[in-house]
Amino acid sequence: MSATVDGATAKPITKKLTFLFRFASTIALWSVALLIIFSGYEIAFFCLIAAIGLLALWEFYGMLDAKGLPNFKITAMLCGAIMLSGSFYYYSKVGVAQSYDFEMAVLLGFLLTVFTRQMFDSLRDDAPLRTMAYTLFGLLYVLWLYNFITKIVYVVPRAPDGAVQGQFYVLYLIAVTKFSDMGAYITGSLIGRHKLIPHISPGKTWEGFAGALAFSSLASLGLLYLMPKQLAVLNPTHAIVLGLSLGFAAVIGDLAESLIKRSTGVKDSGNFLPGIGGAPDLVDSLLFTAPLLFFYLRLVVLAP
């Protein structure tokens, strides 16, 4: 029975209200993040990005723990912190090539550590293989993909005075990704009839998917129109291609986390912010849009 106050039945939280809570919380958090990014204090930006990334990784392994799936959470957290710190240092102070080498070295060290750690546990059927697989998947899916947000800041050449210019592309990334989420919800709520993948996410529709692509494309073109100097390496063709690509990747990122939550029997990955859930719910779409934008900038826009 629903809880009552003075004899009145408490009204259930509607889907619309949940979306509004989630949207407001997301905007509030990323507004703070962008203020820090644009403050010019690169170390402050790193601390914020690292905190969100490590929290997302911790809560991901928490979902596995809730299902009883074995993993080496602490080992992954330590390696994740090293990866984030090293990538920030090499990208901001040394160079891109050295950053790649460092990242590969961390992954190699992580594999060696996980195998060595597993050797001291007893062999129980396929438990060792599952433990190592779950641990490695968590680091790659959450932290390795998430780390591309930092890379985007530094993949764009600095200004002549040495100032970082890549923060505008992080703003672009977040805005286009979140407009995709918004477009999927609004369009799906208004005209959604045909289910997209109901066994993973019953509420998502093909109409919502089309709305996500439309909103992300319009957001991409709109941002280029509003900030032509700040997004100087992009042109309208890039904006259209990225708008469609990032919108598609955002939907896949959202569905990917829904798949993981259904597999682990968890509704929300945590209680990081009202209406959002956990940190993985906050960054799920960005896990695929961030690397996509990075590689597009590096291999298409900024290619020699």
Where would I find each of the regions flagged by the language model?
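Juxtamembrane boundary at the C-terminal end of a transmembrane helix
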Residues: 295-304
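Membrane-embedded alpha-helical bundles of polytopic integral membrane proteins
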Residues: 2-244
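Juxtamembrane interface at the ends
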Residues: 184-185, 189-190, 258-266
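Interfacial loop-to-transmembrane junctions
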Residues: 263-285
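Hydrophobic alpha-helical transmembrane segments of membrane transport and translocation systems
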Residues: 287, 292-295
